Amino acid sequence: MSFIMKPHRHFQRTLILLATFCMVSIIISAYYLYSGYKQESEVSGRASEVDCGDLQHIPSRLMEVRRTMISDASRTDPTVLVFVESQYSSLGQDIIMMLESIRFHYHTEIAPGKGDLPALTDNVKGKYVLIIYENILKYINMDSWNRSLLDKYCIEYGVGIIGFHKTSEKNLQSFQFRGFPFSISGNLAVKDCCINPHSPLLRVTKSSKLDRGSLPGTDWTVFQINHSTYQPVIFAKVKTPENLSPPISKHAFYATIIHDLGLHDGIQRVLFGNNLNFWLHKLIFIDAISFLSGKRLTLSLDRYILVDIDDIFVGKEGTRMNTNDVKALLDTQNLLRTQITNFTFNLGFSGKFYHTGTEEEDEGDDCLLGSVDEFWWFPHMWSHMQPHLFHNESSLIEQMILNKKFALEHGIPTDMGYAVSPHHSGVYPVHVQLYEAWKKVWNIKITSTEEYPHLKPARYRRGFIHKNIMVLPRQTCGLFTHTIFYKEYPGGPRELDKSIHGGELFFTVVLNPISIFMTHLSNYGNDRLGLYTFVNLANFVQTWTNLRLQTLPPAQLAHKYFELFPDQKDPLWQNPCDDKRHRDIWSKEKTCDRLPKFLVIGPQKTGTTALCLFLIMHPSILSNSPSPKSFEEVQFFNRNNYHRGIDWYMDFFPVPSNVTTDFLFEKSANYFHSEDAPKRAASLVPKAKIITILIDPSDRAYSWYQHQRSHEDPAALKFSFYEVISAGPNAPWELRTLQKRCLVPGWYANHIERWLVYFPPFQLLIIDGQHLRTTPATVMDEVQKFLGVSPHYNYSEALTFDSHKGFWCQLLEEGKTKCLGKSKGRKYPPMDSDSRAFLSSYYRDHNVELSKLLHRLGQPLPSWLRQELQKVR
């Protein structure tokens, strides 16, 4: 019995030991599992509630975390889709302003509360490289169908999302984001921000010291995170945490921007807890665009800065530089060279005013000239006169020769090739005499202005090249001739400091790869605000950004500018009378009244010459004088004539006797299919009416071929019409050129759509060419009504049909007629059937598109188009 009991006790003891071992194992496993979970939570917790001093010691795991796919350049267009609350919402406008400033392409849509998203793809290519929501709640609360479509697009094309949280009520808020593993607390005031040095977003932005002080606004949102996919970017302390549930600490730092690494659902996002009023948010916004677009939308870190000091030797007594000021200028130049590679002040002089100050200021003049080799120099005008006030070139040349003589006498270099006009007069709007005189006296190749295309908004300033002189955009820095004393700065000294420390001046440098700053002699005397401004600006840029500041001489700077922006080489002329500042620096001898009120744009061989003849019969309608070089047509907007400038263009038009009732116009039939003409015309004459004539494109093509034969075009004489229109891609160059001139103008819908990009439909009249040929009086009544010209002219009594010519002519006194010249209305064989069939097929799709366009515009279909569409059926 005892023998049987012993094994039984052994067995019990073994079971107890096994059970105990299992329990201990479970407890240990649970402990470590819990510890692991807790550690993971602590990483996220530290990410949302940290001591800024400990940021350097955030676990390196945050840097090594796996990230989702970034946009593939070949699969998406480099365009940003921006969902705004409304067309006029403040934050939406700020977002657009930033995108425009850094010259990124964007498309805006009103964020849909309900309804469909805009098309996100074009065939298999994504239309957008990045999506921005002014209000991220519009994305969060989107209906499931559209949300799934958008998320699928983002995942498939590697597209990220930037969103801003906007608090909707004034009371404190705290809630969980639907479908996301984090919560927010809103409507808070915050202070003392710092940057996470480990954030992969940082590119322009440099993680720096703690920025103490209150941040603008009391509507901040902070993020509380409980998932490792979120990484904080900027932290701040909360100033007003009372009455929040759950409560948050006053002493801890909370994330105001978070980066969703995409581990949760495969989409990377950057979420902002406030708008762009805070300067660090703007910097991170730029970096977020760069990172989420896979650096397709990114800024170089190189910044080129040139500081011009205008008006050297100019100024009233008491506003000029003395010897100590000049020494301070030299010392500061050396100091700035430690932060801005090759930094050199660029001095613009007007020699007439040398030694016109106090005794101390005259000594300052001499000290400047004694240090002439330490600076770069450029000429102003001798007497600081505005060039547009000189109406002849010889007077300008005399002034420039005096200034050059002064320079040679005092050892000032004269070979920099750069000049600036007082008040930017004559640079834009262009005063041709200035450009010619500059080249003859100084061999000027570079200048700058703040006026092209307009002074404001500054983000639209651009460069251009005219008369082989490169014109660069110039920037203001808040210093003008009257800003001499720090305490008397307009709006108070804090306004200047605010501009330097994350304000307008700071972002001028951040957003522009090249900045030429305008300052004045008076800014370097007295309180030396010029030195104060640029020393503090360089310090701030170096502290908070990774930008590489450097200076280049003007010639190198200009070449660098047009390497970066080759599309800006061609100018885009505008009406000087539409901008008061432009009127003030434009010659009083010139008038905008000589610009046309309407344009006849073609296309060729549709009856534009006949229309022109009929138009000038009207007593209130005046045409341009004929051009001797381009078959009477001016051809300004579509050819190199455009680079001659608007003075050249306006010289073709008479001065109207009555600006209100007289209508100037020009007819250039090549405008119709020109790539450049619509944009150029809209810029110079945006209110001009546009008239085009359409005939069957097959007939137009054949007429052009016969026209070229009559002018002995070798290709037209050598090849039949069918050979021309059916030529393949490997045909001889001259044959392909003739083919293009025959066929391309007949793509009517394409060309009209291009004009409609720049002109509203009510400014466009489309004439049926067949009606013009058969019932011109009726058509001319329609034209008069469209133009709004008076008095009404009775074309029924003024036109008569000439059976010999085969078209309508002007009826003169005593029964005589005035018809078009011999080159018009030629008789030639009818088109062969093969060519007719080929062209009918070739233009089929184009004609269908034209019918859709005319239907959209509410215009009737021409009779020839109705006939062609019947063939489609």
Curated annotation (Swiss-Prot):
Keywords: Disulfide bond, Glycoprotein, Golgi apparatus, Hydrolase, Membrane, Multifunctional enzyme, Signal-anchor, Transferase, Transmembrane, Transmembrane helix. The chain crosses the membrane at residues 14-34. It is a single-pass type II membrane protein. Disulfide bonds join C809-C819. 3'-phosphoadenylyl sulfate binds at K605, T606, G607, T608, T609, S703, K824, G825, R826, K827, Y828. GO terms for cellular component: Golgi membrane. Residues 35-873 are lumenal. It holds the Pfam family HSNSD_N. GO terms for biological process: heparan sulfate proteoglycan biosynthetic process; heparin proteoglycan biosynthetic process. Residues 590-873 are annotated as: Heparan sulfate N-sulfotransferase 3. Its EC number is 2.8.2.8, 3.-.-.-, 2.8.2.-. GO terms for molecular function: deacetylase activity; heparan sulfate N-sulfotransferase activity; N-acetylglucosamine deacetylase activity; sulfotransferase activity. It catalyses: alpha-D-glucosaminyl-[heparan sulfate](n) + 3'-phosphoadenylyl sulfate = N-sulfo-alpha-D-glucosaminyl-[heparan sulfate](n) + adenosine 3',5'-bisphosphate + 2 H(+). Monomer. Belongs to the sulfotransferase 1 family. NDST subfamily. This is Bifunctional heparan sulfate N-deacetylase/N-sulfotransferase 3. It comes from Mus musculus. The gene is Ndst3.
